[in-house]
């Protein structure tokens, strides 16, 4: 809910040492603390979605509350446009703030959100988060303060397949205890340091029949457990008026803990390579063990250095460069090209190594015409070890031995980002363009003793680099806004992205009376390119003197030219002609909306 947000920061290149556990960018979100002096309310009522936020004092200047919610209902109007799909979301933000004394503050906040989308009567996908956070802020002095946080998070992912006859869900629960300190040693030197510990419970999946006569038996996959500890120190150092540095080190220690049952494999290798068929296959377990919950199945230790430099060439020009190492101990198992999307998280362990990323970036910034315009560009390169992929025909759903279909490989991503802004005047806007590649090679080319694979294996796509599902060669965003007068303003944006890599059948064969498709090299085809235009007009009525009520009307059209962008492409046989045909699955077309925003 944007009304509940105080500030947002995105870290793509130079990620501070206080953040870890992921090899992607970091989005830092600061929630409002609630107004302790007076009651305020804001919100918006629209044809597609509505939102409401209320905040105010419980005890003036001592305690405050904040509560806000959002919900969308665009799916109610989709049948008007002959669209049988559904897509909606709802969420709730809450926060209580208490000022104990001038040196101590206590905060209790919560978040609950759900997203749902369904494709006709084929499947329904639901996912979301529930988060609770108790934080104690303590001021030791005007130069040192700390935050002690106890956080609970519950991630849920559900999939209902009516044509199969079952509901499936998975998720992660974690308890996070973290202690962060910020120390201003001088006007030019600042230290950040702290520790945190996360205990994970993974639910790989639970199957529940959606009707008594479905023929499906209820089944709970074996839950997995892990613990992740980290300690960090980071410095922000201004060396001169022109040169500033950010540097730090993060230490992480991950333990995969015992579970009810674990397979044992010959040579500890759950995936074998058939040199005659040139395919990877699931290895047959040679036994099982039942380790205690507190037993360590695998441990990993990593040091993650961070370094960033910013140098001002002159008042209008500056350069920056950074190096970041991050480690991710959790792996997302996702079949993004499937017509029924699937997301499952699994921890690193005896057979699955953590991902290690080294990222390098070099950027240039320039102010033009005394800040009227600005220009930014950055080149980056990422090297990732132990990025996972799957063997052909991998079963990701209801699989208690997921290690039998996973291969560790390497990945790389590199590209150029350009951003041109107009910052002042009645006409403002920006143009952003990214040229990039995201590729992987599976298995990786480490020595045999490091990855447990034979150097005689061909690898996926014959051991060559191939596109990851996240590869977007071209990514263009264009935004423009124009303030016509004090009442009317207009804005529009255009988005274009190269289509997502996917797999299409290259042939078929008959097996026991069934037509079975077969595929060529992995991720060699792409979905159609994604693009759309959105427009909006905002009417701000004249504010009445002496009234605190402020309001505006927003008239918008999402996807003006009704582009039915493909979420996936599915192949089927036409029942009338018998011919094979490709079916595009899309979520939204054109969506007009009117929203009334207010605050007081």
Predicted regions located by residue number:
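Short loop/turn motifs that connect adjacent beta-strands in outer-membrane beta-barrel proteins
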Residues: 19, 34-39, 59-63, 102-103, ...
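Gram-negative outer-membrane beta-barrel transporters
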Residues: 380-383, 402-506, 597
